[in-house]
Design a protein with these regions (language model features):
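Active-site histidine-anchored catalytic micro-motif
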Residues: 1-167
Length: 167
């Protein structure tokens, strides 16, 4: 499974034009979240652009669409790790805790159980930014999403390590 996943990632990355002119600083990226057949080429372009500017990213805060989560508040997966065909990736528990304590999201790992919008991004992060951590957040469509984004912007601004948001 590992080799097939790496081969597929490389295939998508090879389709990305090299050294595109980019904005001064990429702080965030928008990525599609369909299966790789439909969305990986664009996701590869986004992650490649981030890599072009930032050789190392400490943490990716990943916002995911809520397809089967019907809670009112954004749900943070705030403990442990996720597993993909490329192995484990660690949740940045410290940053996740700060986000939950902001009052704009709740701790709810179960909300992520039947969602796919975040997990399709994680292998790109593992492959291109080995050692990076994640903070996965399922975000229902509500005004609270805007408030959450503002709070996370403030929180990230106080971090001393490189954090990039993906959604």
């Amino acid at each position: 499974q590992h080799d097939g996943c790496v081969d597929e990632i490389n295939e998508y990355l090879e389709g990305v034009p090299a050294n595109k002119e980019l904005p001064d600083t990429i702080a965030a990226g928008i990525v599609p979240h369909a299966g790789w057949t439909f969305s990986a080429a664009l996701a590869a372009a986004v992650f490649s652009a981030i890599k072009q500017q930032h050789e190392k990213v400490h943490t990716f805060v990943i916002f995911g669409a809520a397809h089967s989560y019907f809670g009112n508040s954004p749900a943070v997966f705030d403990r442990g790790h996720w597993v993909t065909p490329l192995g484990e990736i660690t949740v940045n528990e410290d940053l996740a805790e700060i986000i939950v304590k902001s009052g704009q999201a709740v701790s709810d790992s179960g909300a992520h159980r039947n969602e796919h919008s975040i997990e399709v991004q994680v292998p790109f992060i593992q492959y291109l930014f080995g050692g990076a951590k994640i903070v996965p957040i399922i975000v229902p469509p509500s005004r609270g999403a805007i408030t959450l984004g503002q709070a996370i912007g403030d929180i990230i601004g106080k971090q001393d390590k490189k954090v990039v948001c993906i959604g």
